[in-house]
Amino acid sequence: RVGLVGHNGCGKSTLLKILAGKLARTGGRMTMGSTTRMGYYSQNQTETLDLGGTVLGELRRLSDPRTSEEELMSVLGLFMLGQGYFDRDIATLSGGERSRLALALLFLRRCNFLVLDEPTNHLDLPLIEWLEDYLTRSTATLLMVTHDRYFLDNVCNEIIEIDDQSVYSY
């Protein structure tokens, strides 16, 4: 579980977007294992969620088609989004609700490589604590950017710092 830190504008989010295939590389090579199921969590949920759809539509679009409605409801419940959210338009959700929906989608996809950009933004304390517990128990590989030092220290077992075009590992 690796945390990536550095000052604003040093390229942390850009690196994550390149890894997730959201931005093109300008050079070099990148190889993923054939069994890697990457899940990308953007700090700006409008980049990953269909704002023209409903919560249920987005769950159906981005999760395994064999997932039952009961499992969808159960996962939404874990992220404090009850059944009443199924028919809600994503565009009407608050920033925190969109964040919780995006995290629920990662959970449903059963990713084994999580790339998380500021995952605690817009989350309230109970959900941050739940996410911390989930990530520390998860067997998935984790690469995360966050400015939340407490969360970083509790979740990650390695820290990589980008500073003045240099990289340091702690």
Task: Spell out what each predicted region is.
Residues 1-170:
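ABC ATP-binding cassette signature C-motif
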